[in-house]
Amino acid sequence: NKFMSEDSVITEVGSTKRNLIKFTKNKNLILSHPIAGSEVSGPNFGSKDLFNNKWCILINKGKKSKINTVKKFWKNLGSKVILMNAKEHDKIFAITSHLPHLIAYNLIKTAQDYQKVEKKNIIKFSAGGLRDFSRTAASNEIMWRDIFFSNKDNMINSINKFIKNLNLIKKKIKANKDKE
C-alpha cells in the first residue's frame, strides 16, 4: 500500500468483529474491543483512567508483531488484554453486552407505552432497577441498532434463549410456584 508503511499499525474499537475479519488480510489491521465506557460518548466524557483495570479484547488475527504492538498500547492505558477469535467474541458479547442493551431499550419502551395508555407518569416512581435500565437505554440508539444488525445471528440466538427463560419464569408465576 503506497499510503502506509510496512511498520504501520491500524486498530479499531468496534463492538462486533466477524464482519471485519475480511479486512484483516491487511496484516497491519488488528481488531480491538476495549470493554470500558458509559452511556455517553465523545471527548467531553473521556477520563484518564477510563481503561484502568478494564478488559480489552484483541482478535487473534494478523501479524504477531502487530498484535503485540496493539497489546502493549492497551496495557499502557491500563487495560487487561486477552486474545480470542472473532466468532467467540461476537457470541460472548451478544449475551453480555448487546442483549442487555436490547432489553433496556425494550423495557423503557414498555414503560413509556404504559404511561401513554394509562396517562400516568410512572417513571417518577422508578427506583434503582428501572433507573439502571434507563441509563443503559440512554446510549446512542442508532449505534446500538447497527451493533444488533452486525451481530444478527448471535443476537437472534440470545433473544431466543432469553425468551425461553422468560417464558419459564412466566409459567412459574402463573402456577404460583417458586421451584420445580
PLM feature spans:
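Short, flexible, solvent-exposed loop/turn segments with mixed acidic/basic and small polar residues
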Residues: 44-50, 143-146
